[in-house]
């Protein structure tokens, strides 16, 4: 049944949902990659669609910005609509020189400065990691399409405008591949409610050099990341 944030019914969503932050990117994915896509959510403008990709039923819905927002949608999709797998497809910022604009990053683990997972985990540190099979299938899908990817840790921040730029030095030292705002929360929700999750991100800007993509590019391109996610779902069915 419908929730305060999703006006859909059981069965409207597929068991796998791709989740970009931007609802307009969700619409772009539905219109570009899915067949027979129909809108299944529009509450607060957070657009959601269900269609098929190469005959496989798949949904896509935005999750907004930040861990609180994405946690609401992820939790409701899992507990109220029977979703089993969530793949975040979003943008991230790079802090290391060897990570370049438009590189695709597969988030094997997600560090964070958020306290959300500590609240879930009785004030202990929770290892927010992706599901191994989802990681493996994403890597295999990228190889099959000859798309280079980076696999490793990303960092989910609570503040987009950081008051502590020295933290970027620490991230670089520890080999963080990308900085974003949601993956650690989605991994925590998936673990709490028995689902599987993965974040695949495209580097949209470089925090060190200032190089960046435009808002339009972020909304309508980054197709490599989307194709990896879609093809990985098919591999997971085999």
Swiss-Prot record:
Catalytic activity reported: a purine D-ribonucleoside + phosphate = a purine nucleobase + alpha-D-ribose 1-phosphate; a purine 2'-deoxy-D-ribonucleoside + phosphate = a purine nucleobase + 2-deoxy-alpha-D-ribose 1-phosphate
Site residues by UniProt (Important for catalytic activity): 218
Domain of life from the UniProt record: Bacteria
Disulfide pairings: none
GO CC entries: cytosol
Enzyme class: transferase
Single GO MF annotation: purine-nucleoside phosphorylase activity
E.C. numbers: 2.4.2.1
Name of the protein described by the UniProt record: Purine nucleoside phosphorylase DeoD-type
Source organism (scientific name): Xenorhabdus nematophila (strain ATCC 19061 / DSM 3370 / CCUG 14189 / LMG 1036 / NCIMB 9965 / AN6)
